[in-house]
């Protein structure tokens, strides 16, 4: 690409372009030329590939053809959406000078920078999903992490203590754009993430960060926000705020505070747990058959986004949870009345962000007005609900009668998309605007009268008066009658079958009308900007109202789900444990064609670990996951799928369920499994809920069994976590005999000949066998293979009764039951030097060893 080194060799326009491009070398520059945004050189080549648009050439500059690509200005949002979805950023350069008065190229400047993490335009955002900008910082003491949702003003920071916690935060927040320092050491942690942006070190300086944040919030210090003693988080937040100011180039009044997210305030879930529980994304990367897909019937986009935040960050404060439960219970009788009204509120949260950024469009203000119009009915319906939390929400919603009246007077019922299209401000709002419009709108009547008058005066029946954008107003006469045109008609344009003329009176009226249209549009833009000035002083109360409406939507939704899906209200206990009566998996029960088999669960200080055995496909994984999901739902304040639930304190949820090769990192299935297991053993506490499924299956039988046994021992004896431990190693069913707090349960099945029926019912005690061959037959494995497998199984059982499936009192004899002491015969052989023996001594040793066996 050409550079600014040889500017003089270029045309004036290209000189202007290259200077602007030099200020934004790493992102695409949309350069406004008339009705198009043009891209040149490397930008044009990239855009043609990313957007599938034509790559052409524009003349020559500096003696070389200029690669060029362009998009129409009226379709720019569609193209921006495509680029943002691919992680690209775009600088928008507009004409700010007047072409009529400019000498040389029209003055242009970059008015905004669109990046994946800072978009607020409705067309570029997914309405039911948060769009976050994030920054990450690392030093010797740990990590700093900050996130900002510019479409709501929600600003958060945290200080993850280790790599695993940081990875979990990245997965939970899933930022659209991630800023990192140029010397960031842990690139493996963020490689492959979308929207990575390398930033200079000075942007992360702590003093600069404090100064930036205090300036934004209008404060002298950050003590009031509770973040003063979070230096690593502040470093990340400072860089993030600097980046937003650089890209938005406007004030950010909706970003009014910053909140510290502390680990002790919420239930911690690592990346593997979030993935395995399929909270908002299934294992295939989609959204079907997830917890959110069942639970999210919210009627506003902002409510949907809040519900997903709750699901990914369950709270541990029981006061908050009980308040939510009480609100859900109080709202159950009015959900059918509230939801249709709430639906009309729309996405007030994001409309307010665009208002703050002064990018709100006429239809945004119309939607805001429509939201205000719903408030009286919502407040009236909630007035009858006798619940303190509900009344608190009702108060926070506010009324905004004056703002509603203002928008009803100012904006027409169905405004156009853009202010520049005109016709946004309602008649009667401004007297001067009405006068200019009357003058412009009166043109049609005047032209009709002029046409009738001139036809009568000239006697020319083909005469008509018209207008086009190029030549303005004209009088048209057919070619056949054009020789009869009066002498005061001045020819303006010749067509194939007609001539067009102008007369002084029409020219004078044209100037007057065009002036009135221009003045009306200019005044309309001014009045529209003044509306922002009238609305923005109320921004804080409006944001509080939007948050209350979103929370109401979530709670009404949870009330409806509880009633529709037959959920019950869980109770919280100070004592450790989980007691569930007839628990169900919230997702599986919705996709099954037959009734779901509900099952109990009892974990307590005296029964902290359940060893779960049973056939493949018997329901072990479903049983384990449903326990975690019931706990998760309880800790967002929701009702749960069970007959009754009592649940004690939980600080973390871990899952070690299933695995696949991590080819990108060069890790095998077994390595992935062991890494996740190590994380659990290092971080679980006695208040953690741990799900362990098939530990050790990725290696040899003896290695796997040894690891599974040791892990179970560690969890039961040392950590004492609440653990569900599913296994096919039946030797582990001996654990309850060897240590306290461990019990056996199994998933039932019935076998008849070559067929098997899964009962999906949890029973006390260990399973008698795993039914592996029956499941293989069910899967369609050829009969001759199944027959051969049965023969081989009988051989193995006869050769190695201790290691095979020999049934002893409902369990199996343990591979680990062999005494650890070495036998005397083995010890004697180890100490024997066969090379030093005579034939007679060797014979004596044979008899001696025989006697030791």
Swiss-Prot record:
SUPFAM superfamilies: DNA repair protein MutS, domain I, DNA repair protein MutS, domain II, DNA repair protein MutS, domain III, P-loop containing nucleoside triphosphate hydrolases. Keywords: ATP-binding, DNA damage, DNA repair, DNA-binding, Nucleotide-binding. The gene is mutS. The keyword Acetylation does not apply. The keyword Magnesium does not apply. This is DNA mismatch repair protein MutS. ATP binds at residues 614-621. GO terms for cellular component: cytosol. It comes from Citrobacter koseri (strain ATCC BAA-895 / CDC 4225-83 / SGSC4696). InterPro entries: DNA_mismatch_repair_MutS (IPR005748), DNA_mismatch_repair_MutS-lik_N (IPR007695), DNA_mismatch_repair_MutS/MSH (IPR017261), DNA_mismatch_repair_MutS_C (IPR000432), DNA_mismatch_repair_MutS_clamp (IPR007861), DNA_mismatch_repair_MutS_core (IPR007696), DNA_mismatch_repair_MutS_N (IPR016151), DNA_mismatch_repair_MutS_sf (IPR036187). This protein is involved in the repair of mismatches in DNA. It is possible that it carries out the mismatch recognition step. This protein has a weak ATPase activity. Belongs to the DNA mismatch repair MutS family. One of its GO terms (molecular function) is ATP binding. GO terms for biological process: mismatch repair.
């Amino acid at each position: 690409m050409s550079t600014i080194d040889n500017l003089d060799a270029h045309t004036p326009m290209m000189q202007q372009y290259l200077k602007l491009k030099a200020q934004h070398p790493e992102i695409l520059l949309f350069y406004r030329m008339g009705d198009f945004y043009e891209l040149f050189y490397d930008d044009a080549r990239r855009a043609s590939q990313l957007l599938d648009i034509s790559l052409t050439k524009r003349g020559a500059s500096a003696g070389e053809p200029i690669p060029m690509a362009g998009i129409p200005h009226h379709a720019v949002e569609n193209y921006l959406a495509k680029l943002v979805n691919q992680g690209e950023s775009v600088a928008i350069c507009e004409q700010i000078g007047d072409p009529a008065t400019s000498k040389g190229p029209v003055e242009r400047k970059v008015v905004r920078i669109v990046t994946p993490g800072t978009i607020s335009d409705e067309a570029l955002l997914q309405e039911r999903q948060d769009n976050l900008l994030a920054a990450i910082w690392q030093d010797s003491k740990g990590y700093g992490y900050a996130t900002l949702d510019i479409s709501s003003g929600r600003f958060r920071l945290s200080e993850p203590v280790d790599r695993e916690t940081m990875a979990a935060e990245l997965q939970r927040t899933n930022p659209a754009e991630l800023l990192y320092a140029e010397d960031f050491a842990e690139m493996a942690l963020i490689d492959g993430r979308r929207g990575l942006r390398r930033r200079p070190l000075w942007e992360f300086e702590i003093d600069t960060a404090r100064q930036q944040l205090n300036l934004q919030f209008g404060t002298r210090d950050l003590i009031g926000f509770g973040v003063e003693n979070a230096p690593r988080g502040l470093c990340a937040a400072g860089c993030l705020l600097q980046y937003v100011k650089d890209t938005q180039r406007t004030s950010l009044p909706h970003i009014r505070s910053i909140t510290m997210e502390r680990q002790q305030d919420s239930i911690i879930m690592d990346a593997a747990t979030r993935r395995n529980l399929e909270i908002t994304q299934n294992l295939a990367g989609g959204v079907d058959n997830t917890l959110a897909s069942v639970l999210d019937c919210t009627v506003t986009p902002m409510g949907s986004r809040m519900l997903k935040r709750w699901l990914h960050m369950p709270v541990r404060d029981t006061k908050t949870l009980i308040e939510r439960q009480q609100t859900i219970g109080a709202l159950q009788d009015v959900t059918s009345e509230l939801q249709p009204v709430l639906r009309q509120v729309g996405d007030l949260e994001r409309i307010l962000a665009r208002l703050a950024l002064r990018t709100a469009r006429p239809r945004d203000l119309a939607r805001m007005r429509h939201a205000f119009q719903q408030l009286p009915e919502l407040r009236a319906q909630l007035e009858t609900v006798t619940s303190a939390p509900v009344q608190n929400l009702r108060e926070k919603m506010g009324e905004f009668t004056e703002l509603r009246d203002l928008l009803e007077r100012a904006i027409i019922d169905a405004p156009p998309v853009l202010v520049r299209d005109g016709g946004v401000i309602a008649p009667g709002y401004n007297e001067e605007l009405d006068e200019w419009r009357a003058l412009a709108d009166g043109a049609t009547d005047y032209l009709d009268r002029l046409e009738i008058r001139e036809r009568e005066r000239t006697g020319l029946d083909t005469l008509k008066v018209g207008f086009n954008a190029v030549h303005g107003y004209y009088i048209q006469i057919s070619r056949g009658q054009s020789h009869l045109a009066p002498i005061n008609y001045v020819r303006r344009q010749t067509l194939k079958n007609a001539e067009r003329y102008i007369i002084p009176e029409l020219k004078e009226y044209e100037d007057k009308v065009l002036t009135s249209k221009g003045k009306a549009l200019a005044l309309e833009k001014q009045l529209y900007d003044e509306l922002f000035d009238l609305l923005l002083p109320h921004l804080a109360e409006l944001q509080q109202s939007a948050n209350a409406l979103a929370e109401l939507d979530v709670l009404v939704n949870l009330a409806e789900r509880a009633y529709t899906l037959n959920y019950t209200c869980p109770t919280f206990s100070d004592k450790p444990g989980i007691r569930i009566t007839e628990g169900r998996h919230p997702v599986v029960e919705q996709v099954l064609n037959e009734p779901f088999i509900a099952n109990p669960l009892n974990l307590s200080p005296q029964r902290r670990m359940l060893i779960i055995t049973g056939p493949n496909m018997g329901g072990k994984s479903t049983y384990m996951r449903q326990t975690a999901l019931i706990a998760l739902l309880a800790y967002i304040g929701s009702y749960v799928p069970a007959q009754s639930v009592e649940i004690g304190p939980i600080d973390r949820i871990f899952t070690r369920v299933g695995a696949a090769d991590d080819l990108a990192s060069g890790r095998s299935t077994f390595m992935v499994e062991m890494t996740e297991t190590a994380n659990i053993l290092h971080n679980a506490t006695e208040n953690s809920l741990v799900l362990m499924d098939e530990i050790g299956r990725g290696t040899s039988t003896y290695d796997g069994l040894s690891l599974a046994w040791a892990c179970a021992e560690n969890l039961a004896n040392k950590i004492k976590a609440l653990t569900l431990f599913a296994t096919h190693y039946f030797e582990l069913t001996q654990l309850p005999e060897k240590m306290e707090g461990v019990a056996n349960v199994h998933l039932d099945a019935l076998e008849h000949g070559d067929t098997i029926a899964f009962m999906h019912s949890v029973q006390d005690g260990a399973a008698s066998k795993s039914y592996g061959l029956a499941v293989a037959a069910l899967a369609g494995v050829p009969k001759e293979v199944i027959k051969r497998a049965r023969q081989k199984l009988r051989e193995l059982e006869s050769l190695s009764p201790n290691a095979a499936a020999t049934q002893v009192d409902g369990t199996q004899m343990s591979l680990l039951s062999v005494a650890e002491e070495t036998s005397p015969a083995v010890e004697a052989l180890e100490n024997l030097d066969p090379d030093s023996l005579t034939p007679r001594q060797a014979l004596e040793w044979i008899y001696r060893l025989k006697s030791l066996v």
